[in-house]
């Protein structure tokens, strides 16, 4: 048994010997493994995998090849511009960018998926639309949507100012540049937000759309022209309504749209939560001490092949109304979303929802930024019936906490409220050597780069209430609006880009941290907690298991374990980098997708792995070895427990996101996001490919040079020459109509 596999099983809390022998409790109760529900659930997978793993570009210990043959067998490799699945599996495209949805269209860069069943073989699929990939969107918009936009005119207007952008908000209404920017921004924001589509499974196993009354879009401009405003609850509403120091959009607590919708979660009562993540790309993130937003001029409109940003500028969107968790009831065609402000405003990724009768409601979420925190909301009231839609009202009163991880494996929750002491961690303990704090009295960010600055800040401000202004309700609202900086000031632990937060059947929380390297703007994680074997920043990511004391969702302290699964097999890794979304099947197995940056996918790596200056390449630069972003399966029982197997990989330059099983586990819904993000539409002929030399290592450390044939750009999902790449949602199924998770290899 490899050390990495042993570490994984111990991380789950199971005896390695017990798992290897296949000896599980026969009582029908939960076993010691937190993902496992019952002995009968595990029985189906004890004898083997349910699929033949896809062969990726990197030799793995699980390939079944002798090490001496791996160099020969992996000397050449061709990447496919397709969603590649095991033999015996198929996928059907359910919806793609530009398809009609209600009175709008299917948006761009689909992410989180949620399927709420409404009857046998039918239900409502809720889809997030996160952001615009500039190059393919600009290149193919007219081809896909069927109309042109004034891109050339905007480029001409941008030429004198370059990347600094245009303040369209303050241009006269009759200015043609303002009109052009408004038109493009409107179309881009229509492609963001959320969508609900009704679907049905046919007798042959394929899923088709049924176009019910529930089908609708909630876009980035909902409410602007159609009156479909989003609502809000909680303390920040008092800030939205006040006449304060900052910019006023004159809408009170009404909110125009939702965007940057990344991952999310689904409640037992049938509603869906969507996290607004990188909203700072479109509106100002920073706020004043009273929680009111900075003016739209702080986030200008920009457009080039790398970014279309500042989309909220021309419409005067208020920045403090974005960065929230949005709840939608997909079955209610008149529900266009509610932002629950007690859950905090930050760059939300996913949400882990813990609902138990007789206990308080707990929501866990991570801020997906370098130095972001883990948060927990605990309701004031208790749950009576987990399936009662009235549980949504429990989100209107409670408290938001941020996690403090201690190096000894313990931790505590810090309340983000006015009387919480100011006690920031020092810049010197963080990767990157900085920590951002609330700037006072001006508002915005103060970057502390020296320990003395953080110490002086603590002496100047005693409590969070000293940093924010207003009456008690407004002050609490301002703290929630400025949650990231407030958590920094209170001493919450800066982490390593937290992604998914998943609740296991035993109540423990699993968190994926996708990258431990810092940035110049946000800094990085606490190196006492998040470090590689050399004590330095670690790129490939971790999974953390957090257990509340007393297994109580309202506990104020916890225990935690961390496991570095990512990396090359030669270095003890499982063969992937940057873990992202997790999914747990009924048998307790772990399904995972990863999120490597598009510019790192299949990147060339020279023999010897030295950069142009003759220095060893960084972990980030070495990510080309892993190929495309992929879907991984990690069994937690049976003879293969703890090993990682590739279930599939996505088309070129994409990320696979939002995995979600139907209740019978015969279908895996998956979102394919941003195919062709780096190079756009793939051209036909020889120009559509490159042969790249990539230095690989066998699991025992032998270096060799692979010739990898790499398609440049994408034509997925049509897969015909010069077809536009389109984000799309697919349904994956076995050709024999058996469950994906438990059927055995024949």
Name what the model sees in each region.
Residues 11-746:
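Conserved small-residue
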Residues 1-7, 14:
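N-terminal secretory signal peptides
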